[in-house]
Amino acid sequence: MMGVLKSAIGDMLMTFSWVVLSATFGIQTAAIISAGDFQAITWAPLVILTSLIFVYVSIFTVIFGSASFNPTGSAAFYVAGVPGDTLFSLAIRLPAQAIGAAGGALAIMEFIPEKYKHMIGGPSLQVDVHTGAIAETILSFGITFAVLLIILRGPRRLLAKTFLLALATISFVVAGSKYTGPAMNPAIAFGWAYMYSSHNTWDHIYVYWISSFVGALSAALLFRSIFPPPRPQKKKQKKA
């Protein structure tokens, strides 16, 4: 029980920190472009953002270890057969991630200077609800399968894994920016929705929770069918 509580606290702190930090990615990117005089380079924002994600994910991995800030990711690893979690531990960890995200959104909006507030925000629905749900399902499926493939079947070196994760993340973010923000993470979507009191609406639950989980768990089931987990070896009974 204590191990589960420690994991939940780690998840909550990591999600809180990630929401606060990721909310400033736009500010950091703009500052780097301005400082380096990269305004004329059209691909500069994507390269800078990918680099920021790579650096911060590397730092978070060192600080928080195996903690997670994505409920669909935690559930997907469980469904894919990765040892570590149980349904009980997930029932405690997932709400902790949502609480951390809500705290992070409230904190950054409280303490960020007024002149930067227009540059901060979370996922928001850019299309009708059904189109958004389809988009979030596809995006969550894609990013989840990519993450499982990179972490479980990808390169052994941690830096190589982290770079591929950053590249996959920015690719799906760009692909989904005209649809759902995108989120591909129910906790982060919940945090910003809570900030604007829309966390309990059907549109939010349908697009950012139900659709995200359908996509992520479908990816986990497909991954498990392609790469089944090793069967536990039966202990040989000693003959009397």
Curated annotation (Swiss-Prot):
A motif (NPA 2) lies at residues 185-187. It comes from the Eukaryota. A motif (NPA 1) lies at residues 70-72. Expressed in roots and above ground. Expressed in elongating regions of the root tips, trichome cells of the rosette leaves, vascular tissues of the flower petals, stigma, stamens (anthers and filaments), pollen and the top and bottom (receptacle) of siliques. Keywords: Endoplasmic reticulum, Membrane, Repeat, Transmembrane, Transmembrane helix, Transport. One of its GO terms (cellular component) is endoplasmic reticulum membrane. One of its GO terms (molecular function) is water channel activity. It is found in: Endoplasmic reticulum membrane. Pfam families: MIP. The keyword Endoplasmic reticulum applies. Gene3D superfamilies: Glycerol uptake facilitator protein (1.20.1080.10). InterPro entries: Aquaporin-like, MIP, SIP1-1/2-like. It is a multi-pass membrane protein. The chain crosses the membrane at residues 13-33, 44-64, 89-109, 132-152, 163-183, 203-223. Its main location: endoplasmic reticulum. Disulfide bonds: none annotated. PANTHER family: AQUAPORIN SIP1-1. Aquaporins contain two tandem repeats each containing three membrane-spanning domains and a pore-forming loop with the signature motif Asn-Pro-Ala/Thr (NPA). Belongs to the MIP/aquaporin (TC 1.A.8) family. SIP (TC 1.A.8.10) subfamily. Water channel required to facilitate the transport of water across cell membrane. This is Aquaporin SIP1-1. It comes from Arabidopsis thaliana (Mouse-ear cress). The lineage of its organism: Eukaryota, Viridiplantae, Streptophyta, Embryophyta, Tracheophyta.
